[in-house]
């Protein structure tokens, strides 16, 4: 498996920001007059900096050293692949590198934003040069891929090009690589592994594809306004303190609230971009768009109007800005000018009343699983997929959402599983990024008596405890928690507490993400008394204010939670996942342990459970495939280049395709799983009967997210009206998961839980007999 290996590329893609590919062609090679800061932008930057100095956990002043991190971070935000800025640009801007502190907080009350806007304008200038050069290459070059050239895929740690000639060499390599990838995708037969002859117009189609791609991406960058520049600049400032502090303008703050609340006020549509048009990808069931019966998938939105006001054209508008126009307070009207899929020349106006949209795909869900017991009967176990620790959060000026609570939803699901007499429960926290700390504490309290769940230390060194105040226990049976390298923050708190108490067995990757910090939201308006109520919202600053610790006293920062049983996974070998891979993380440390009543429900069985699991994993065919992928991934990690030789690349891709098809063939020949799965949702958990069992095939076990987070491109432009990338990623994962292979992690965890139940029963029998 070579440089075209998908596993490699999916890791590269997830790291790169959308800006990494924002180059252009001549269609958008002109740039409007230079941007200037908005009237309040300097004040916003000043207040943000002062809040970071005052409230951040590190208590670090914005000094010369922080200025260096601030400056470097801004360049990284704009040009993460180090292929547009020249070393001459860096030399020209170098006097700012140690002076951003003075420019930001030196003047009383207002920051000097000259560096932010001049650096951005230089970036656009370099993109225009990139534009002209790529356009020239596509017009005149007949690309040949017969030599031994290679391209360094990940340039994050490489120096910026020395001069324009060096930059052109990088641009040429990148374009040739992208051209080759397009060509390869057209050369392999979709039905077998044969190499197909290219059609006569193939080169022209590839040029058209790349032209459109570059045009659109460049347009998105040069379409920035002053708020976009300020957003990027203040992100660099806050990230200089740690990777989780942030500045949110109004749009980003709303997205954060929606992520936490799992609801928004809008029309209920999933939107995407297609050739410069905002396109309806799907309708959310029960939303205003769905109920209107006037909107359909693939319809284009060409203009948006608020109530009776004039319509605003949204053709070629950045998708996030279209989203902002469509969202609005509950009960208000929005008029959409639609170009229907069946007749693009037609224009029709659809008036919708905004309503609250529930994002049910992101809430907790359960499955009742019936497994054969080997004696002619069945064992019943429960499975709960918890994508995040969500909770209602209202920002100043926002309308009240209906109350949403992770703990309340999980309680309903567990009560239903208990009603169905499950012998044990699996809770899946894989790819759970965290969320509400309060919800994580309350969730943990469902499984333990009262006591501390998490410790926290503030900047003054004061240690506090977040306790479960409720002595009742909702579920006292066998419990297994699944984690992976993407389980973070509040998910780590819950997993760590249940592990420290000896209440749950933790299974999964080598460790969780390692985010052991707590953030607080600080709207800027209260710090700005003179700001008129009619003035646009100045934004919100998210600040890391505490570090949290396990009840054992160890931090989860950097090191994460190590499971009781580790399963093989390619994710275990990526250095680019986890807190340690981010810029400016806070260090790991310990504090004194809390006093808590430790249970002994796990440790007596861990050795036997691990031995049995290891024996199964050693011979399980899916884990054999995973170990093969791990070996290939290690080879890829050792060589970060990709070949530009067509024959070599095509052979590699053909080999990879053949390997995957052989695996698919082997899997399809397997006997269908001898189990029944019943889907339980928050909505149907209160019903007395179970729904019909799900149809199962050899390639469709339970839909979960483990190991497939990289099966989507980080540059995809599908948005719910939330425009929230993490949720879109999960939504796309969940819609595609049914075509993926079985989830061996979950299947093995089911086996582990069955062993755990059996061992606990034997132990109870021995105690009873004694």
For every predicted segment, state its role.
Residues 1-12:
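N-terminal secretory signal peptides that target proteins for export/translocation
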Residues 15-27:
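Bacterial N-terminal signal peptides
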Residues 32-37, 50-63, 214, 219-226, ...:
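Cleft-lining beta-strand/loop regions that shape enzyme active-site pockets
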Residues 62-68, 72-150, 218-273, 333-335, ...:
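Extended, small/polar residue-biased N-terminal targeting/export presequences
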Residues 153, 177, 181-192, 200-212, ...:
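Conserved functional hotspot residues or short segments at active or partner-binding sites
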Residues 490, 502, 507-577:
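Polar, glycine-rich mid-to-C-terminal structural blocks
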């Amino acid at each position: 498996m070579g440089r075209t290996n998908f596993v490699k590329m999916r890791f590269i893609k997830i790291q790169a920001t959308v800006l990494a590919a924002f180059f252009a062609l001549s269609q958008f090679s002109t740039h409007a007059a230079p941007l200037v800061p908005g009237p309040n932008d300097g004040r916003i930057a000043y207040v943000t900096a002062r809040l970071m100095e005052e409230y951040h956990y590190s208590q670090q002043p914005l000094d010369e050293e922080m200025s260096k991190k601030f400056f470097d971070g801004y360049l990284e935000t704009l040009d993460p692949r180090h292929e547009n800025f020249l070393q001459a640009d860096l030399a020209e801007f170098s006097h700012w590198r140690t002076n951003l502190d003075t420019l930001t907080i030196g003047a009383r009350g207002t920051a000097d934003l000259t560096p932010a806007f001049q650096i951005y304008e230089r970036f656009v200038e370099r993109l225009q040069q990139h534009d002209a050069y790529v356009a020239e290459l596509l017009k005149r070059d007949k690309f040949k891929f017969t030599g031994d050239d290679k391209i360094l895929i990940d340039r994050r740690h490489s120096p910026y090009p020395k001069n324009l000639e060096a930059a052109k060499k990088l641009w040429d390599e990148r374009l040739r690589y992208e051209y080759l990838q397009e060509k390869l995708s057209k050369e392999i037969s979709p039905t077998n592994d044969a190499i197909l002859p290219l059609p006569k117009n193939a080169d022209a189609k590839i040029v058209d594809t790349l032209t459109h791609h570059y045009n659109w991406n460049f347009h998105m960058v040069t379409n920035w306004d002053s708020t976009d520049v300020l957003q990027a600049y203040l992100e660099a400032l806050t990230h200089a303190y740690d990777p989780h502090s942030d500045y949110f303008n109004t749009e980003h703050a709303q997205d954060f609230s929606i992520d936490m609340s799992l609801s928004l006020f809008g029309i209920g549509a999933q939107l995407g971009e297609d050739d410069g048009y905002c396109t309806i990808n799907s309708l959310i069931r029960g939303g205003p768009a769905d109920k209107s019966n006037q909107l359909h998938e693939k319809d284009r939105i060409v203009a948006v109007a608020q109530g009776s006001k004039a319509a605003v054209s949204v053709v070629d508008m950045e998708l996030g800005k279209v989203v902002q126009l469509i969202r609005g307070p509950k009960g208000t009207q929005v008029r959409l000018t639609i170009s229907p899929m069946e007749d693009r020349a037609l224009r029709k106006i659809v008036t919708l009343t905004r309503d609250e949209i529930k994002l049910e795909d992101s809430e907790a869900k359960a499955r009742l699983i019936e497994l054969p017991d080997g004696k002619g009967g069945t064992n019943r176990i429960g499975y709960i997929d918890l994508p995040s620790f969500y909770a209602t959060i209202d920002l100043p000026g926002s309308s009240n959402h209906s109350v949403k609570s992770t703990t309340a939803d999980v309680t309903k699901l567990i009560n239903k599983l208990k009603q169905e007499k499950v012998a044990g429960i699996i809770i899946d926290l894989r790819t759970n990024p965290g969320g509400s700390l309060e919800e994580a504490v309350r969730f943990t309290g469902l499984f333990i008596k009262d006591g501390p769940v998490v410790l926290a230390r503030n900047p003054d060194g004061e240690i506090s405890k977040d306790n479960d105040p409720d002595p009742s226990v909702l579920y006292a049976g066998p419990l297994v928690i699944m984690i992976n390298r993407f389980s973070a923050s509040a998910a780590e708190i819950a997993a760590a507490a249940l592990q420290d108490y000896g209440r749950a067995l933790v299974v999964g990757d080598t460790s969780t993400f390692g985010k052991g910090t707590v953030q607080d939201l600080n709207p800027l308006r209260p710090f700005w008394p003179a700001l008129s109520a009619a003035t646009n919202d100045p934004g919100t600053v998210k600040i890391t204010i505490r570090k949290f610790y396990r009840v054992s006293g160890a931090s989860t920062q950097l090191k994460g939670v190590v499971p009781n049983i580790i399963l093989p996974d390619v994710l275990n070998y990526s250095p680019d996942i986890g807190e340690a891979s981010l810029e400016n993380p806070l260090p790991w440390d310990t504090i004194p342990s809390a006093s808590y009543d430790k249970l002994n429900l796990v440790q007596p069985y861990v050795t036997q459970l691990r031995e049995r699991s290891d024996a199964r994993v050693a011979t399980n065919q899916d884990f054999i495939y995973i170990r093969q992928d791990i070996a290939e991934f290690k080879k890829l990690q050792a060589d970060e280049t990709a070949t530009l030789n067509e024959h070599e690349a095509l052979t590699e891709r053909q080999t990879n395709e053949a390997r995957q098809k052989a695996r698919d063939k082997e899997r399809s020949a397997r006997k269908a799983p001898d189990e029944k799965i019943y889907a339980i949702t928050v909505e149907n958990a209160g019903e007395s009967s179970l729904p019909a069992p799900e149809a199962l095939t050899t390639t469709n076990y339970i839909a979960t997210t483990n190991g497939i987070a990289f099966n989507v491109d980080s540059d995809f432009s599908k948005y719910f009206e939330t425009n929230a990338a993490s949720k879109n990623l999960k939504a796309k994962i969940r819609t595609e998961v049914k075509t993926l292979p079985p989830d061996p992690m979950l299947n093995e965890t089911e086996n582990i839980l069955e062993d755990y139940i059996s061992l606990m029963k034997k132990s109870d029998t021995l105690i009873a007999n004694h």
